[in-house]
Amino acid sequence: MKTPQFILASASPARRRLLQTVGIEPIVSPSDFDESQIQETEPGKLVQILAQCKAETVAPQFPSGLVMGCDSVLAIDGKIHGKPIDADEAIARWQLMRGQVGDLYTGHVLIDKIQNRTLVKYQVTKVYFANISDRTIQAYVATGEPLKCAGAFALEGFGSLFIEKIAGCHSNVIGLSLPLLRQMLEELNYDVTDFWK
């Protein structure tokens, strides 16, 4: 079977770097899907719906592609948190998160245009937040990093200082679960090494 082009339907530099780390050089084609039109309150369902909508928006442009869509949210006490809209929201979010445990959900969708198949899955990872001071929160938010990430933190950046531990898939917290991606590729009868550049 011919190996399709690997298309990443995301503007996330972290997701692209994760793929590059394991030898996959994706064609990046960010989706312009308006996430605000989806009103789902269960985080596992929400990230799968959003990831699928993103992938489906991009897929028609690549008739022989394998299109990956992803979406991440953080849930604390059942409340869903995406990217904060501004610094004030990021500060308030961190005041809520500090000393708490959250669940980071990432939806993963692969649309294989060659086989006309779609896989939709999600991964969840527990994140244990440090109990940091207001001063530290303000300094972290001032870096701008929390405004770019679901959950208002980046495990691969300054945010790693404020995460006590994670339970589950490390790469899932950064933006996509590499083990889940490998499993999904196998389910589509590909070997991840087929995509190595």
Swiss-Prot record:
Enzymatic reactions: a ribonucleoside 5'-triphosphate + H2O = a ribonucleoside 5'-phosphate + diphosphate + H(+); a 2'-deoxyribonucleoside 5'-triphosphate + H2O = a 2'-deoxyribonucleoside 5'-phosphate + diphosphate + H(+)
Record key words, sorted: Cytoplasm, Hydrolase, Nucleotide metabolism
Enzyme Commission code: 3.6.1.9
Needed cofactors: a divalent metal cation
A Pfam short name: Maf
Any one Gene Ontology BP term: nucleotide metabolic process
One Gene Ontology cellular component: cytoplasm
A GO MF label: nucleoside triphosphate diphosphatase activity
CDD domains: Maf
Cellular compartment(s): Cytoplasm
Active site: 71 (proton acceptor)
Acyltransferase in keyword set: no
Superkingdom of the organism of origin: Bacteria
Entry keyword tRNA-binding: no
Role played: Nucleoside triphosphate pyrophosphatase. May have a dual role in cell division arrest and in preventing the incorporation of modified nucleotides into cellular nucleic acids.
Similarity remark: Belongs to the Maf family.
Annotated protein name in UniProt: Nucleoside triphosphate pyrophosphatase
Organism this protein belongs to: Nostoc sp. (strain PCC 7120 / SAG 25.82 / UTEX 2576)
